[in-house]
Structures are given as structure tokens and as C-alpha cells.
């Protein structure tokens, strides 16, 4: 899948809903955040996964810090992601060829 940040793309996406964990008075995701337009994509262990939206917000052209702030927003107990997964895209393409 060829992907150019900020450009429209046709892709197979997966919806993911994360309920944040309560740690004292804080809400936490329970995982680390990697990526962003200002980061080296080869350093991301899931570099084929692209988070397209977080709670309806377009994430295709945000920096790492902007993504972190959106994902860790204190007022949101649930994070709804729209994720493009290249492995899912490949599986769908294979099933269509069979």
C-alpha cells in the first residue's frame, strides 16, 4: 500500500476502542505511543499500522507530540481509533483473489 500523508487513500480499516485504565486520579492508555510526521517510521515496531483518526480527529498529518496529546486527553475515558493495517489489507486482497 502506497501512502502519502495528507492525501486521500482507499484502504481497509479497523475500528479499535480503548478504555483507559485508572491509575490513581489519572487515566492511562497502558501502552507507549510511537510515530508522527516528525518521527523516523523505521523506529516504529508496527510501522505498517497507520492511525487515521482518534475520536473523529484526523491524525494523518500530526506530530508525535500532537498525537500524544490527542490520545492522552484527560477528559476522554474511551479512545476510538480508526487504523489502517497493511496486514489486514493484504488478507482482504488475498481473499478477493481466491
UniProtKB/Swiss-Prot annotation:
Molecular function (Gene Ontology), one example: beta-catenin binding
GO cellular component: cytoplasm; nucleus; plasma membrane
Membrane topology according to the record: Peripheral membrane protein
Domain PDZ: residue ranges: 12-87
Gene3D superfamilies membership: 2.30.42.10
Signal peptide: none
Entry's Gene Ontology BP terms: negative regulation of cell population proliferation; negative regulation of protein localization to cell surface; negative regulation of Wnt signaling pathway; Rho protein signal transduction; Wnt signaling pathway
Modified residues (N-acetylserine): 2
Keywords (A to Z) from UniProt: Acetylation, Cell membrane, Cytoplasm, Membrane, Nucleus, Wnt signaling pathway
Compartment(s) where it occurs, according to its Swiss-Prot or TrEMBL record: Cytoplasm; Nucleus; Cell membrane
Tissues of expression: Detected in kidney distal convoluted tubules (at protein level).
InterPro entries named in the record: PDZ_sf
Chief site of localization: cytoplasm
Subunit relationships: Interacts (via its PDZ domain) with GLS2. Interacts (via its PDZ domain) with RTKN (via the C-terminal region); this interaction facilitates Rho-mediated activation of the FOS serum response element (SRE). Interacts (via PDZ domain) with ARHGEF16. Interacts (via PDZ domain) with KCNJ4 (via C-terminus). Competes with LIN7A for KCNJ4 binding. Interacts (via its PDZ domain) with CTNNB1; this interaction inhibits the transcriptional activity of CTNNB1. Interacts with ADGRB2.
Function recorded in the entry: May regulate a number of protein-protein interactions by competing for PDZ domain binding sites. Binds CTNNB1 and may thereby act as an inhibitor of the Wnt signaling pathway. Competes with LIN7A for KCNJ4 binding, and thereby promotes KCNJ4 internalization. May play a role in the Rho signaling pathway.
The protein's name: Tax1-binding protein 3
